[in-house]
Amino acid sequence: MNKKRLLIVDDESGFTRLLKLTLEKTGHYTVLEENDGTAAWLVAREFRPDIIFLDIVMPKIDGGDVARQIRSDPLLSHVPIVFLTAIVSKNETGSDIGGFPFLAKPVSLEALTQCVVEHLGQ
């Protein structure tokens, strides 16, 4: 079976670790976690994820800037980006910065899995 490659970028290491362990336990995904937004673009270039889950609010660089870096990279511009945030109003979307809709934290495994299926068809 060809496992989908997921990159989770969030400065909350406990959150990314929990998502990684939970998703990998299903046997369908290979998950890489990155807690530094400034390293996310380089990590994505090396890992070549099928989808990126990206926190909006991070120290040093925000998720919007990371998304713009990814979108401008010919190797990564096709990769779906799903924004993760605890700060969401019902009228906000991620489309204004080249991404896909937000998932509100705390994110359930069901919501995350459904999002992967919607974007990658698994």
Descriptions of predicted regions:
Residues 13-32:
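Two-component/phosphorelay signaling modules centered on CheY-like receiver
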Residues 107-118:
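C-terminal output helix
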Residues 58:
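Receiver (REC) domain active-site loop signature in two-component systems and cognate sites
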Residues 10, 55:
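Active-site residues of response regulator receiver
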Residues 82-84:
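Hydrophobic/aromatic residues positioned on beta-strands within the core alpha/beta folds
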Residues 47-53:
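Active-site beta3 strand of CheY-like receiver
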Residues 34-38:
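Conserved Asp/Asn-Gly motif in the active-site loop of CheY-like receiver
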